[in-house]
């Protein structure tokens, strides 16, 4: 329990590295980076980097800019793994702290790559499919498919499937929040 403040602070440091990855590649490919900073997201501090300037980069470069944050986290995970093993072999209590930090880091990576959250995974999918406003268009596609007459239904399957997954995901998430899971 006494390690939690250290884990909390160090997880912010890893998040800074994540955002630094976006900044470095955006600056490399575009020469400019938008605003960076800290904001409150669900009453929790969250770092952000405005990479809208990357819209003018080539598609492959945009994908690399989006993946740069997770790449930095994966590099941190490798370093944390080596340090964890070294600390455990030395019999240090720091091994537990490093293990907890690495687990949190992997949870952040998973959450970041989940395309149903509007984080890096969402933007990867949006750029890969070359569809701007993916959330809105996918939900609109589901509503259009549901409301259209049978003979008028011509749907974009990708948008429809993503929209159904998105709606289902948020129904489950909000239900879990409401009932307190």
Predicted regions and their residues:
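Membrane-embedded catalytic scaffold of the fatty acid hydroxylase/desaturase
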Residues: 2-154
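Hard-cation-handling environments
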Residues: 149-181
